[in-house]
Amino acid sequence: VNPLWSFYDEGINPRTRTYSLFALTGTREFMEAVGNWGFLAQVPFGELFWEIRNFVSIVYALLHERLPYARVYHAHTTGYASLLGAAGARDYGTSFLLTEHNLYIRDTVNTKLERNMAKPVTTDYAFLNEEREHPGLGPVTLDERAWSVWFVEMGRFCYPSADMATYLYPKALEEARGIGAPIDQMNEGEKDRAIILPNGMLIESVAEAYYARQA
């Protein structure tokens, strides 16, 4: 279990919280810890404070109230939808189904950076150092970098909580592995939990039921 879930349990979940995570983001200790992480050390303090506060405020707004009960929580994207699904399943000990109709992290980051939508996004963040496709854009800005890292890491955080994840085609599953989906761990048991589920259906598989209805 990702240790970051303890922040949710202790600082956000209304059923278990003992402090406000949102309030914590304004403390000196929190900002010092965040400011020493990777490229964030290069971000001016004022910009970093508001960047972090914007991200955390969305998470807090989504999760600080008690989530409704469901036997299965379903999201068809990673990002905030998966965060809600994973949190709900954690709260009630139920299931979380992720059906990735497309790779939301890849598409969202590529849209933000104005890259070709088919280009892969990976957890080594090499894509942030690539030459921009449109010369007028210049280097990736600190805001774009922070935004991209936030969405990639949010996906990596949510993926392991899925009881099952589906993909439309094999390449999508492999790209999900590159973004941080634990495909090998999900498929190491007796039954695969990360599977290919293409669009459409085989008519013969439902023919019997169809003809029974016509009778």
Regions found by a protein language model. Give the residues of each.
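Non-catalytic, alpha-helical, charged scaffold/linker segments
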Residues: 1-47
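A short, active-site helix/loop in glycosyltransferases that binds the activated sugar's phosphate group
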Residues: 27, 148-190
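Membrane-proximal helix-turn-helix segments that form the acceptor-binding/catalytic region
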Residues: 60-69, 104, 125-164
